[in-house]
Regions:
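A hydrophobic membrane-anchoring alpha-helix module
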Residues: 157-174
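Conserved small/polar residues in nucleotide/adenosyl-binding loops
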Residues: 185-190
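C-terminal helical accessory/scaffold domains
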Residues: 172-183
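Cysteine-centered iron-sulfur cluster-binding motifs in ferredoxin-type domains/subunits
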Residues: 16-35, 62-82
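Ferredoxin-type iron-sulfur electron-transfer modules in oxidoreductases and energy-metabolism complexes
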Residues: 1-13, 36-67, 81-146, 162
């Protein structure tokens, strides 16, 4: 009993985020995610404090830990100085480390997002590249996005004179050497 709790306590965010929760519920009362989901940060902290491996494992495999928007509204309001947002960040990290996130739909969505952003960074040097957000893959963006996509040089040219061209400035095309350096840096870090 407590092996997952011990693993969580190795994360500095747990040491900063969990002192001694008294279950007052202020964190849940101010949580924006609790307005949209069946989500209760107080309950998550309560489960973690029990040190019950089965209950913590259930959390690590659930969508619940992925509902938090990490706004940290909970941080300044807790009368005991807890930060449920930090506890949830530590839970997410452990879920990823143990591979439990794949049992959660929201966890799998995070993986897909991480892959897309990572691939964009390695290909272009940017997290989000407007040219790679294809209108046919994102119909929710509507006709305005189609127009922006079709006229990107004109639209983004208003913000930067070097849109997807070499030079200094935002949204510039990075030279191949810089992109290779990014790739070397990320492979060295792994």
């Amino acid at each position: 009993m407590g092996k997952y709790f011990d693993m969580l306590m190795e994360d500095v965010r747990m040491k900063e985020g969990l002192h001694s929760c008294m279950n007052c519920g202020v964190c849940t009362g101010v949580c924006p995610a609790a307005e949209f989901y069946n989500y209760d940060p107080r309950q998550i902290v309560n489960i973690v404090q029990t040190r019950d491996d089965d209950a913590i494992e259930e959390l690590l495999k659930s969508d619940t830990i992925w509902y938090c928007g990490e706004c940290m509204s909970c941080r300044p309001r807790c009368p005991r100085g807890n930060t449920p947002g930090y506890v949830i960040q530590a839970l997410r990290t452990l879920s990823q480390k143990l591979g439990f996130f794949v049992e959660s739909e929201k966890g799998r969505q995070q993986l897909a997002l991480k892959r897309i952003i990572g691939e964009n960074i390695l290909r272009t040097g940017y997290c989000i590249v407007p040219r790679l957000v294809k209108p046919e893959l994102h119909p929710e963006q509507g006709t305005v996005w189609q127009w922006i996509y079709d006229n990107d040089k004109e639209v983004y040219g208003q913000f930067t004179p070097v849109y997807m061209r070499h030079g200094a400035g935002a949204l510039r095309r990075l030279d191949e050497q810089s992109l290779e350096d990014c790739l070397l840096y990320t492979s060295d870090a792994a």
